[in-house]
Amino acid sequence: MSDALKKSIVDAIEEGQLKLGYREETIRLYYPLSSLCTLMHQSMDAAQMTRALTTFSEQVKGELGEIEVSRKGERFCLAVGPKGAAWVHEHTDPSGFLADFIAAIGRHGCTMDELLAIFRRHGGHVHVEALHNGEFDWLVYFEDGRPDAYYYCIADEGCRLTYHRFTKEDYEAFGFETT
């Protein structure tokens, strides 16, 4: 079983539940083949990945319930059923870093200083880097991967801050320029 893929699925569902609230419903997550290969720690073509994901879904069925796998070309959809949504809701921390981060960035008038204070409150080694790539203004992440290993790309949209979070590997694959 791919622990990295399971973590990615759980983290994405948790993020959605923190933003939109919990509902016991099917959640569809979309992944490009390249990201799945990184998460599965091996190179595969689309047909091989489909088989690997079918095996993976059987392995995590006890926790995440049924996961329906479909694809169009090299774009995969993992449809996690209501049982999986409920399991994530019951097994994630509603008061951790991600909850604090999402609550702050979702508030009108949130500043970068507020976000950095949240990062520093939850972890001791915070990397902050100004970006000049036309997409994002800052890259922030926990250097030691605790409490999470995602790369947070934050943009100042003038009236509010927005973000996208990436695995280190996906961030590097995008080739964003840094200062």
Question: Where are the regions a protein language model picked out?
Answer:
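Negatively charged, low-complexity tracts enriched in Asp/Glu with abundant Ser/Thr
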Residues: 97-129, 167, 175
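Positively charged, polyanion-binding regions of nucleic-acid-associated proteins
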Residues: 1-29
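A cross-family detector of function-defining hotspots
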Residues: 117-151
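Long, charge-rich, low-complexity intrinsically disordered regions
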Residues: 88-99, 127, 134
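Intrinsically disordered, low-complexity regulatory segments enriched in Ser/Thr/Pro
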Residues: 146-177
